[in-house]
Amino acid sequence: MEPNKSILQIMKSNSDKVKIILGNIITMLGNRIYIDNNGDSKPLLDPTNAFKNMEERGDNVFIIKADNGDLYAVKVIFQKITAISKQSVISEFLDEYETYKKIIVTKDYTGKIDTFILRNSGQIFKEHEFLADLLSNEFQPRFQLLSPSEMESVKTEYNANPYTLKKIVRSDPIVRYFALKKNDIIRIIRPSATSGQGIDYRVVV
C-alpha cells in the first residue's frame, strides 16, 4: 500500500490533498459518537452538514462544529515536525485554539510530539493516514462504538473485565481513529462462513 500512497502524494497538489484530508477527517468524526442527555449514543456529526458549514480560518486551519457543540480546529502542515518551540507554528495553533479539540495533520512527527499534542487536547496524524478513509478499506471488519451502558452490559453478559477481554493498544490506528480511551470497549464484526458474522470485543489498554 505504501507505493500507492507515495504516488498519490506526488500526483496531488497541496490544495487537492487538503480537500481529501478534510473530507476524510469529517468522515472520521462522523463515525465517532457522543452520549446525549438521555444516555444514548449519537453520531458526533453529520458529514454532509459538517463539510458544508466548515469554516476556513486561513493558513490551512479549519473549524468543524460537532452536533454535541464541540468545536474542532484542524491544522494541515506539509512538513515533518521534529520539535516544538514557543514560537513554532504548532505552539501558536495550540495557544490560539486552546478551548477547541484539535486535529493536526503533518507529513511526519516524533513520538514526543504525539505525547505533547495529546496533553493539549489534540491528536496528530500523518498525512498519508487521511489520503483515504481507514474504514473504507474493503478488508476492514466493521467496528461499533459502545455507550457506557453497553460496555457494562458486555461485562455482565460475558463476565468480562479489562483483564479477561482481548486487548487493543492505544497506538492502534483504529483506537486513534475513534479517539478511544483506556478501558473503552469496542465491538468488532467480521464475516463468518458458519454463522454469517462473528462478533468479538476488544478493550483499550
From Swiss-Prot:
GO molecular function: DNA binding; DNA-directed RNA polymerase activity
Localization, UniProt: Virion
Enzyme Commission number(s): 2.7.7.6
Gene Ontology cellular component terms for the protein in this record: DNA-directed RNA polymerase complex; virion component
Pfam family, one: RNA_pol_Rpb5_C
Keyword Transcription found: yes
InterPro entries named among the record's database cross-references: Arch_Rpo5/euc_Rpb5 (IPR014381), RNA_pol_subH/Rpb5_C (IPR000783), RPB5-like_sf (IPR035913)
Transmembrane segments: none
GO aspect biological process, one term: transcription by RNA polymerase II
Principal location: virion
Reaction(s) the record says it catalyses: RNA(n) + a ribonucleoside 5'-triphosphate = RNA(n+1) + diphosphate
UniProt keyword annotations, A-Z: DNA-directed RNA polymerase, Nucleotidyltransferase, Transcription, Transferase, Virion
Superkingdom assignment: Viruses
UniProt similarity note: Belongs to the archaeal Rpo5/eukaryotic RPB5 RNA polymerase subunit family.
Annotated PANTHER family: DNA-DIRECTED RNA POLYMERASES I, II, AND III SUBUNIT RPABC1
Entry function: DNA-dependent RNA polymerase catalyzes the transcription of DNA into RNA using the four ribonucleoside triphosphates as substrates.
UniProt-recorded name of the protein: DNA-directed RNA polymerase subunit 5
Source organism of the structure: Acanthamoeba polyphaga mimivirus (APMV)
